[in-house]
Every structure is written in structure tokens, then in C-alpha cells.
Amino acid sequence: MRRVYTNRRAHHEYELLERFEAGISLTGSEVKSVRAGGVDFRDAFARINGSDVDLEGLYIPVYKEATYNNHEPRRKRRLLLHREEIEKLRRGLEQKGLTLVPTRLYQKGRYFKVELALARGKKLHDKRRADAERTVARELREL
């Protein structure tokens, strides 16, 4: 694994329950742009459409060196999962309050992979408690 992009906001906004690895279908200009850097997870989420899983809202900047055949920066991108994994995700999403959030984008061999997580949104008091626990742990390490 070489270049890794993480969704740091997902760890703050959500309680991550279960993780899945999925391939992602990218065009040539998207691959070059990801290698150049600048991926943004800010509004990214995954949705199950029939037998497919789509990643929406992931921002991959336009590749500067590409010609007229460049990609749309926030287009839907298809995720590649086994049928059993899709059914497991579908059963998980049927539970109230769960959503599918991308947590990492990385290169594994020649291919780019996305790590998805079934997640439950945190309330404000949960975020504050997590911040307080991190602060206490940091102070204990410093002693």
C-alpha cells in the first residue's frame, strides 16, 4: 500500500461498527489525479442501488494534464464487492440510524481500494465524551 487518504472526519462524526474493503471503478484521469493528490471525503457516502454499491460525493480533482476527456470531480463511482458482502451491507443498513461511510482510499498492488464502514452517527455529547477521553489518555502518556 502506497498512498493512503483517510477520512478523519468519519472517526469524529460516526461510531464505526464494521469495516469492508471494496474495489473502486476509476477512469484513467481519475487514477492519475488520485496519484497526484487532493482527494476530499468531506461529503462522501455510499449507497446501495439494486445489486450495485455507489460511492457518491467523493471529490477527485480534475487532472490538469488530461485532454477534453476529463472526468467530473464528484461523479458517482461504482464500488466492487462480492454479492454476499452487498447483502451483509444491505442487512446492516436496514437497522435504524446506520449509514455507509468511506474511511480510507488506498492503493493495494495495482488497484485502488476503498475501506467502507457501517457507522452510526454520534450525538454532540458522545463527541464531547470521546474528546475528553482522548485528552485524558494524552495526559497520561505525557506523565
From Swiss-Prot:
GO terms for molecular function: RNA binding. One of its GO terms (cellular component) is cytosol. PROSITE patterns: SSRP. Keywords: Cytoplasm, RNA-binding. InterPro entries: SmpB (IPR023620), SsrA-bd_prot (IPR000037), SsrA-bd_prot_CS (IPR020081). The keyword RNA-binding applies. GO terms for biological process: trans-translation. It is found in: Cytoplasm. Its main location: cytoplasm. PANTHER family: SSRA-BINDING PROTEIN, TMRNA-BINDING COMPONENT OF TRANS-TRANSLATION TAGGING COMPLEX. Belongs to the SmpB family. HAMAP family: SmpB (MF_00023). Required for rescue of stalled ribosomes mediated by trans-translation. Binds to transfer-messenger RNA (tmRNA), required for stable association of tmRNA with ribosomes. tmRNA and SmpB together mimic tRNA shape, replacing the anticodon stem-loop with SmpB. tmRNA is encoded by the ssrA gene; the 2 termini fold to resemble tRNA(Ala) and it encodes a 'tag peptide', a short internal open reading frame. During trans-translation Ala-aminoacylated tmRNA acts like a tRNA, entering the A-site of stalled ribosomes, displacing the stalled mRNA. This is SsrA-binding protein. It comes from Deinococcus radiodurans (strain ATCC 13939 / DSM 20539 / JCM 16871 / CCUG 27074 / LMG 4051 / NBRC 15346 / NCIMB 9279 / VKM B-1422 / R1). The gene is smpB.
